[in-house]
Amino acid sequence: MSEQNQGQPDQQHSGDHQHHHHHHHHHHHSQQPAQPIPIDPNVNPANRIGRYQIIKTLGEGSFGKVKLAQHVGTGQKVALKIINRKTLAKSDMQGRVEREISYLRLLRHPHIIKLYDVIKSKDEIIMVIEFAGKELFDYIVQRGKMPEDEARRFFQQIIAAVEYCHRHKIVHRDLKPENLLLDDQLNVKIADFGLSNIMTDGNFLKTSCGSPNYAAPEVISGKLYAGPEVDVWSSGVILYVMLCGRLPFDDEFIPALFKKISNGVYTLPNYLSPGAKHLLTRMLVVNPLNRITIHEIMEDEWFKQDMPDYLLPPDLSKIKTSKIDIDEDVISALSVTMGYDRDEIISVIEKANREAAAGGATPTNQSKSTNEVLDAYLLMKENHTLVKDLKKSKSENIESFLSLSPPPSSSFPNPGSTSSAPGVQQSLTYQTLATVPDLSTLPNSTIAILPTSLPSIHRAYMMETKVNDPQQQIPAPQPTKKLKTRWHFGIRSRSYPLDVMGEIYRALKNLGAEWAKPTEEELWTIRVRWKYDSTPQLRVWQRTNLMKMQIQLFQLEPNNYLVDFKFDGWEQTSDESKNDASLDYKQQDLDEVGSFSAYPFLHLATRLIMELAVNSQSG
């Protein structure tokens, strides 16, 4: 990696920088004074949503309009993020969006924009969120590059917020200048945490085209899975910009920019300290498997300098070995926010403690992954502990953290009405494909099916039908105590990743498939070609054709992996395509059949799964 002294050009780049980022209209720009604006009694009352008087439109984000509003009773300023349900229907399933948003209400961190409440109407979901009036990057543009101490203070706040969300299984995936806001004390507030999940399906990041300069190589190359590592890369780009006053990867021509990012080509100015250089070179690593993790960043010497105590994550080693206490305050808060039943919460905690005592998983390991109620309880308990610690340390951030949520709007449903709300499983795994809610929690009239969830919902439905079949003579379980079933895509495994890959290769070989030699970057992806036997009924199968499939291994959580199968199109066998004038038609036929029939793919995926099952039994 070459190093060069950038000297003067840095000052020019801060001007360019403005050009790059401010063609985005974004929500939190505002020039208004800090003191509350008295609401004019003559203001148009139609310009109200619930108890909020709209002051002005702040901008348009990836999710719809964002408006500045003021609570009629308290005068507190909030931002209203208005999501049109029509846009959601295209990209996703509304029931899931509402579950995800209700889980985001539990996130409480001094450096994350708080979601105070959600107002739902027939056409819109309106998120009532904390208002922060400035953007970190306007500040950088005005100041040019920052001294290291100042950049480190911002960076520590960003990393602490990201670590908090990752610990609670939410990845931002779209960290960029517009999402880094500042309050009046120049504290960072990260916006839109958890929202990328709502807008994406199996083919990741439809909204990322806004700021490709900050996107990780695996995101711009369209990888199916992008986990916590993408936030590390984006944070590295942000740190570079703060320290150098310009972007590490920049080009007016998008394909050239993508090439620079994919190759990880950037320069480090000589004026950076060795500690800052070392951290940047560990964060901006193209292969996500070799990239530094958030926890390793928090152990880095340069990073730890002058680190305020309130930003340190809780000591996880203590939590893992201790029993989970039953805290009535947390339980009542949780039943109001998420609609869980008090007895259900207590039985989940006791079960987790029993499993831990029996020498099984620790409370924060296996049980946590199998029960979203426990996830939500631990998250809220941590919030309560953090508040106590902040009070003890008399931190100046306590005000920001505890700032009261606006009183509920008259149009909110009462807390009891949310008790039938489905759980938040979709938020609780790193990738959007991993889980599908158990059917028993879905209201009967509103089952809406995600395209990617179809097989799981079908299986869950079939299983439920069997259970409810009177001929089976199975007594129906009490609905409140019903054991929730989790449905996953692909195959789950607790074996070592390399063993899993070895098993898959062995099964593919037994079935006569062929595969491309994996590159180092794609160690956990297998690109397979498979001859699909012809069937006389379809003229298109009169020739032997190759079906392509991608098999990828994901990590769901420590020691828990998921094997995912993805259909990757058709290919004509090379020996038959020579001198064939009708090749174009054949290819067209193949594409048509591929787009209308999932059976060949499902057939081969089933054979592979059965082969793996046979192998594991005989092994």
From Swiss-Prot:
Record key words, sorted: ATP-binding, Carbohydrate metabolism, Kinase, Membrane, Nucleotide-binding, Nucleus, Phosphoprotein, Serine/threonine-protein kinase, Transferase
Biological processes annotated in GO: CAMKK-AMPK signaling cascade; cellular response to glucose starvation; establishment of mitotic spindle orientation; fungal-type cell wall assembly; invasive growth in response to glucose limitation; negative regulation of inositol phosphate biosynthetic process; negative regulation of TORC1 signaling; negative regulation of translation
Membrane topology qualifier: Peripheral membrane protein
Positions carrying Phosphothreonine: 207
Chief localisation class: nucleus
Top-level EC class as recorded in UniProt: transferase
Membrane spanning residue stretches: none
Basic residues bias locations: 18-30
Region (Disordered): 1-45, 399-423
Catalyses which reaction(s): L-seryl-[protein] + ATP = O-phospho-L-seryl-[protein] + ADP + H(+); L-threonyl-[protein] + ATP = O-phospho-L-threonyl-[protein] + ADP + H(+)
Domain Protein kinase: 52-303
UniProt xrefs under Gene3D superfamilies: Kinase associated domain 1, KA1 (3.30.310.80), Transferase(Phosphotransferase) domain 1 (1.10.510.10)
Catalytic residue list: 174
Single annotated GO MF: identical protein binding
EC numbers for this chain: 2.7.11.1
Compartment(s) of residence: Nucleus membrane
Residues involved in ATP binding: 58-66, 81
Low complexity: bias regions: 1-12, 411-420
Cellular component GO terms held in the UniProt record: cellular bud neck septin ring; nuclear envelope lumen; nuclear membrane; nucleotide-activated protein kinase complex; vacuolar membrane
Function: Essential for release from glucose repression. It interacts and has functional relationship to the regulatory protein SNF4. Could phosphorylate CAT8.
PANTHER family associated with the record: MAP/MICROTUBULE AFFINITY-REGULATING KINASE, NON-SPECIFIC SERINE_THREONINE PROTEIN KINASE
Homology family: Belongs to the protein kinase superfamily. CAMK Ser/Thr protein kinase family. SNF1 subfamily.
The protein, known as: Carbon catabolite-derepressing protein kinase
Origin species: Candida tropicalis
